[in-house]
C-alpha cells in the first residue's frame, strides 16, 4: 500500500504565531540568472533600481548567503524542487531527465490539499509536471535531450553553447523572445490569482510558482527599462584577470563560451550590464505587479511569498560571463521569505541553499519529507524563527565547461571547490569577498601565520570531507554513460517524424468569456470582483468556480 503523506510526522509548532494548520497560500517567485551580489538589498552601492524588491526585503526574512545547488539552470531547478543534490537524481546538465518517482515540493503540497500550479520556466525534460497539478504556460527552453554535454569530445563547442552574441548584441529592443515569454507568464499568473479569489467557498489553498526568464541573457530590454539607466555611469567589473592567469576551469569556460579570442571593450561591457540592469528592473516591476494583485484580490495577508533564483551571472567579473562557475556572482542567489504574521523581518547570515526549500515548505504546511527517502535539503525554519540553523551548503556541477565532476562546500566563512581535473580552491569570504586569494596554496607549505594555519586546517578538513562524500570516478562513469545514452536516443528521435516533449498547456477558449449557453447577466456578475448582487451592492460571499 502506498504511504499516506498526511500520516507523516508533523512539524512541531515552534511559536504561538506559527500555525501550519491555517494552510496559507504560497506564492513562489523565481528569477533566472539573477546574481545576488548585484542587488541593492545585498549591496547598498548597487546601481540597479529595484524598489519593489527592496520593499519586500524590508518586511521579509532575508538570507544574505543563499546558494544554488548547481550553477546551471536545469540541475539547479531539479535539485530545488526535489531537495536532492544533482548527482542523486541524475540531473547532470540542461538535457537531463529526473525520474517521475522523485517527490517534489509540489507532491507534498498536493498531498496537504493545495492546488499546485506553475507559470513559467522550469526546464523539465520528459515529464512536464513533476507534481504540479496545472502548468499555465509552456516552457521557454526545450524539454528533450537536445542539449546534452559531451565529455567524450571536451574541446568541441556545441551549437547551443553560450557565445559572445549576448554581449556583442546587447542593447535596446522593442520585443524579444524573453519578453514574449514573461509577458505571457505574468498574464497567466495574475489571471490565476483572480480566478482563485473568484472560486467558491470550498476552494483549496494555492501554491503558485511564477518563474520568470529575465534577467537571463541575451542582454536586451525595452527602451522603458534601458532609459532608467540613462544618467548612470555603469560600473565596470571590480576584478579583471588576464585569461592566461585564470584557473583551469575558468579557462575552459572562456573557450566553451567562445570568449577566449575576444577582447570585449569597456563600452560593450557597459551596454551588456545596462541591459541586464534594465532586465532586473523589469523583473522588479513583475514582482510589484504580483504583490499588487495579491493586495487587490485580498490575498496578501494569507499568502506566504518566497523569492529566489536558479543561479547568478558573472557579468564580466574576472573576465567571465553567464554562470557555470562557483564564484559568488554565479552561484549566489537571492532568498526572501515573507509572511510577517509568522516571521518577523530579519537578516540571516548563515549559508543556506535553494535545496533547503522543500523541507522548509513541508514545515510551513505541517508535514515532513518522507523519512523512508533520502533528503539533502535542511529546513530553514529555525532561521525563519530567529534560532540557530544550518550553515553548510553543498553544490555539484557537471555541465558545460567541465570534464570531470566539480563540487563545492560552503560553510562559515569558507568556500571550498574541488574537481579531479583542476587545482583545488579555498577562499575565506569574510576576509576575501572578491575571491582573489586561493588559500589552497597553504596545503603545500609550512604556514607562517595563524591565518594560514587556520586555512590549512580548514583545507585538510574539506579535502577529507569531499573524499568521503563523493566518489569522483564512479560519478564520472555515470555521467559519461548518461551522456552517451541520451545522445544515442536523441540522434534516433531526430530522424523521421519529430514528436515534441514540450508542454502544451490547455486553454479552451470555448469555456471563457461570453458564450450562448451561459446566462449573460449571471456570467458578468460572477466574473466581477469584488462580487455584487443584482442591484450592484458589494457582497462578500464567493459564488464562482472558474478552475477545476
Residue ranges and their predicted role:
Residues 443-498:
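A contiguous, mid-protein "functional segment" used to position or interact
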Amino acid at each position: 500500500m502506498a504511504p499516506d503523506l498526511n500520516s507523516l510526522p508533523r512539524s512541531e509548532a515552534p511559536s504561538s504565531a506559527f500555525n501550519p494548520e491555517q494552510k496559507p497560500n504560497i506564492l513562489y517567485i523565481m528569477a533566472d540568472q539573477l546574481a545576488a551580489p548585484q542587488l541593492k538589498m545585498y549591496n547598498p552601492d548597487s546601481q540597479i533600481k529595484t524598489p519593489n524588491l527592496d520593499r519586500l526585503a524590508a518586511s521579509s526574512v532575508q538570507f544574505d548567503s543563499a546558494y544554488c545547488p548547481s550553477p546551471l539552470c536545469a540541475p539547479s531547478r531539479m535539485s530545488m524542487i526535489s531537495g536532492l543534490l544533482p548527482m542523486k537524481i541524475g540531473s547532470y546538465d540542461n538535457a537531463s531527465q529526473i525520474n517521475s518517482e522523485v517527490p517534489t515540493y509540489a507532491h507534498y503540497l498536493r498531498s496537504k490539499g493545495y492546488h499546485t500550479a506553475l507559470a513559467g520556466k522550469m526546464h523539465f525534460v520528459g515529464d512536464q509536471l513533476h507534481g504540479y497539478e496545472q502548468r499555465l504556460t509552456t516552457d521557454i527552453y526545450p524539454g528533450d535531450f537536445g542539449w546534452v554535454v559531451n565529455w567524450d569530445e571536451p574541446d568541441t563547442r556545441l551549437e547551443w553553447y553560450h557565445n559572445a552574441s549576448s554581449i556583442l548584441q546587447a542593447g535596446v529592443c522593442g520585443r524579444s523572445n524573453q519578453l514574449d515569454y514573461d509577458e505571457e507568464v505574468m498574464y497567466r499568473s495574475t489571471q490565476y490569482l483572480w480566478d482563485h479569489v473568484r472560486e467558491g467557498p470550498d476552494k483549496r489553498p494555492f501554491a503558485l510558482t511564477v518563474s520568470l526568464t529575465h534577467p537571463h541573457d541575451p542582454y536586451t530590454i525595452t527602451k522603458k527599462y534601458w532609459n532608467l539607466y540613462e544618467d548612470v555611469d555603469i560600473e565596470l567589473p571590480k576584478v579583471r584577470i588576464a585569461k592566461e592567469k585564470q584557473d583551469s576551469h575558468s579557462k575552459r569556460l572562456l573557450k566553451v563560451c567562445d570568449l577566449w579570442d575576444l577582447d570585449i571593450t569597456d563600452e560593450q561591457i557597459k551596454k551588456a550590464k545596462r541591459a541586464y540592469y534594465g532586465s532586473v528592473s523589469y523583473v522588479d516591476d513583475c514582482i510589484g505587479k504580483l504583490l499588487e494583485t495579491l493586495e487587490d484580490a485580498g490575498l496578501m495577508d494569507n499568502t506566504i511569498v518566497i523569492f529566489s533564483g536558479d543561479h547568478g551571472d558573472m557579468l564580466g567579473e574576472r573576465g567571465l560571463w553567464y554562470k557555470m562557475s562557483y564564484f559568488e556572482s554565479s552561484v549566489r542567489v537571492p532568498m526572501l521569505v515573507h509572511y510577517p504574521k509568522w516571521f518577523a523581518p530579519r537578516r540571516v547570515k548563515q549559508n543556506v541553499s535553494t535545496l533547503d526549500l522543500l523541507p522548509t515548505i513541508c514545515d510551513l504546511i505541517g508535514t515532513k519529507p518522507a523519512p523512508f527517502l533520502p533528503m539533502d535539503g535542511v529546513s530553514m525554519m529555525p532561521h525563519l524563527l530567529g534560532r540557530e540553523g544550518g550553515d553548510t551548503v553543498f553544490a555539484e556541477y557537471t555541465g558545460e565547461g567541465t570534464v570531470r565532476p566539480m563540487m563545492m562546500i560552503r560553510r562559515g566563512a569558507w568556500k571550498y571547490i574541488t574537481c579531479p581535473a583542476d587545482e583545488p580552491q579555498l577562499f575565506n569570504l569574510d576576509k576575501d569577498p572578491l575571491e582573489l586569494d586561493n588559500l589552497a596554496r597553504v596545503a603545500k607549505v609550512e604556514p607562517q601565520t595563524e591565518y594560514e594555519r587556520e586555512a590549512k586546517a580548514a583545507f585538510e578538513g574539506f579535502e577529507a570531507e569531499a573524499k568521503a562524500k563523493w566518489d569522483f570516478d564512479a560519478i564520472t562513469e555515470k555521467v559519461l554513460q548518461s551522456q552517451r545514452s541520451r545522445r544515442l536516443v536523441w540522434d534516433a528521435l531526430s530522424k523521421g517524424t519529430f514528436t515534441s516533449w514540450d508542454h502544451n498547456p490547455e486553454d479552451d477558449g470555448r469555456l471563457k468569456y461570453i458564450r450562448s449557453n451561459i446566462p449573460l447577466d449571471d456570467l458578468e456578475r460572477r466574473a466581477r470582483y469584488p462580487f455584487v448582487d443584482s442591484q450592484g451592492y458589494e457582497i462578500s460571499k464567493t459564488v464562482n468556480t472558474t478552475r477545476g
